[in-house]
């Protein structure tokens, strides 16, 4: 049973997923700090409020924090979109290379059959 678990845990997909989760958490911290400490203070200065996230509230509802979370989400979603686009481009190139090899093999077999 331990051997089966080890084989499962060391499969490429499981390791890739584990690495992606760790990297995603780290990336989330980077984007959150970028939004919280750089972008939101600049937006706060534009609107005349020193702390946009905390000062923009109405009846205890902190709209500034909500807007900060939206900006955070947009940055992460855009970064993931770019990553997926790049990954898809790389995968398509690999598929085209495989097609060429498969076609070459088939043509070689046809040629050999025609020689007989």
UniProtKB/Swiss-Prot annotation:
It is found in: Cell membrane. One of its GO terms (molecular function) is mechanosensitive monoatomic ion channel activity. It holds the Pfam family MscL. PROSITE patterns: MSCL (PS01327). Keywords: Cell membrane, Ion channel, Ion transport, Membrane, Transmembrane, Transmembrane helix, Transport. One of its GO terms (cellular component) is plasma membrane. It is a multi-pass membrane protein. The chain crosses the membrane at residues 7-27, 64-84. Belongs to the MscL family. Homopentamer. Channel that opens in response to stretch forces in the membrane lipid bilayer. May participate in the regulation of osmotic pressure changes within the cell. This is Large-conductance mechanosensitive channel. It comes from Staphylococcus epidermidis (strain ATCC 35984 / DSM 28319 / BCRC 17069 / CCUG 31568 / BM 3577 / RP62A).
